[in-house]
Regions:
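N-terminal nucleophile
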Residues: 1-78, 83-274
């Protein structure tokens, strides 16, 4: 996963909404999102090379579970240019996990363990998001750089093994809208800033799901003077600056919209691009 915007407790009845693009090399085999045969309550894509995932949810009643037809629309409570927090007393029945890599080619270890297993292991577990972070924290430096976003139905936690300077690292996030790419949470990369603002606008408008997929299909590249410097060649930096990445060997392979409901199983809709 290389770009994810998400809203936590700003939409009544829907504690978590996320929209994301997964960017990957085209020759890396993967499986589209669906229930996992060995663990049917997990609904996620799968990396067929290392066995982990980049994003997924749990549906506690398995692949045949149903949800009400009249669940809340995706409309946030917007006020004074921001969002009114929405408190939900009950724990949502589904879990959510997503990961992005931190782009640092000079700090990449090809022998490091698979970061995708951090997602699949959380989805298969029952511990809280904070407890899971504390479990993996001692060995986190062994992985290449990553950001994890974890929801246990009660709290949403962001954790990065490169995020020590940020006080939010490993702690429950406050209600709000967030953006994450291949740097730390809310880093002001052009595509993060732009997509986060558009996502917030769609939430205030109560836009249909199709609008979120249109947002994720934006191929606009950032001007050179606004590109981050991450250690890759300039032309690659230009390619990677788009929300939807297009290049001969690497690009956006799936777009996904996830809704974690307060009183119904989570819904994950994925568009496979390549």
């Amino acid at each position: 996963m290389c770009l994810i915007v998400f809203a936590w407790r700003v939409v009544p009845g829907v504690p978590l909404i996320a929209a994301a693009n997964r960017d990957e090399y085209f020759d890396r085999a993967s499986q589209a999102a669906g229930p996992w045969e060995e663990n049917p309550h997990v609904v996620a894509g799968r990396d067929l090379k290392a066995g982990g995932s980049w994003m997924g949810v749990t549906r506690p009643d398995g692949p045949e579970c149903q949800w009400p037809a009249n669940v809340s629309p995706l409309r946030a409570r917007c006020q004074d240019g921001g969002f009114a927090p929405v408190e939900t007393a009950d724990k949502a029945p589904s879990r959510f996990a997503a990961i992005t890599n931190i782009r640092a080619p000079d700090d990449f270890d090809p022998q490091a363990p698979s970061r995708g297993m951090l997602v699949s292991n959380f989805l298969s577990a029952t511990m809280s998001a904070r407890d899971y972070v504390e479990q993996i924290r001692p060995g986190a430096k062994a992985y290449n750089g990553f950001n994890l976003v974890l929801c246990d139905g009660e709290e949403l936690v962001w954790f990065s093994n490169r995020g020590e300077p940020d006080a939010r690292n490993g702690q429950p996030l406050a209600p709000g809208v967030y953006g994450l790419s291949n740097a730390l949470l809310d880093s002001p990369w052009p595509k993060v800033v732009r997509t986060k603002a558009q996502f917030a606008s769609l939430l205030c408008l109560g836009a249909p799901e199709e609008a979120y997929f249109e947002m994720l299909a934006d191929t606009t590249r950032a001007p050179d003077q606004r590109l981050p410097e991450t250690g890759v060649p300039l032309e690659r930096e230009r390619q990677l600056s788009a929300v939807k990445i297009e290049s001969p060997d690497y690009g956006t392979r799936t777009s996904t919209v996830v809704k974690v409901y307060a009183e119904a199983p989570a819904v994950l809709h994925e568009q496979v691009i390549r």
